[in-house]
Amino acid sequence: NCKSFAKLNLCLHILDRRKDGYHNLESIFCIIDFYDTLSFQKNNSNKLNFQTNSNEIDSTYNLVTKAYSVISNLYDIEGVDIYLDKKIPIGSGLGGGSSNAAVTLLALNEIFKLNISKDNLMKISEDIGADVPFFINGGAAYIGGKGDIVNNISVDKKYFVLILPNLKISTKDMYASLSSKDFMTQYSLDELMASNINSFEKIVMSKYPSLKETKYWLSAFGSVRMSGTG
């Protein structure tokens, strides 16, 4: 069994829109001790057999099956049974799907002794999702570009209380809602480390008033931040 950890954005600044349709961003990501579990077993069918306890995940097309397809197109690998025990809520801003994809790449690399270096695995993972390279790397990192620039940083040990409203917020929809007035100028690393700004927060709060009320109530108890796109 492999743990597939969630992440938090300690801040998330959107800088501009790229010609390829992605956005340039700056963020501080850190892994937290909250995780899904994936199990892997070779099979003789030369196909992927994917199952999960979540009825919200399309069992034929998701980031785990996409990760398997990417590797099977590049390397001659056998079939695998994969079971995903889902605990990280979908659409929660915690990167669960990207983490699942990264763990799948790492597991297939080990199971089939493909000897793909971490740098190459991170490069391969860019085609699966913008956050996947970070999860290949793990730890805490400065994230730049479209998510493909991952530089390790040191973050003091912190404790977080996760509040998970019963909402599913689409990353695609949130990026589509961005306009140039939401873009930010580039910060230094020290400024970024001290920031609690999330470029998506105003958009999310305007679309989901209940979330705005929740943040207002929680702010009486300490620093409140939003992770990811919600």
Model-derived features: where do they sit?
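A short, flexible low-complexity segment enriched in Lys/Arg and Gly/Pro that occurs
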Residues: 65-79, 105-106, 194-213
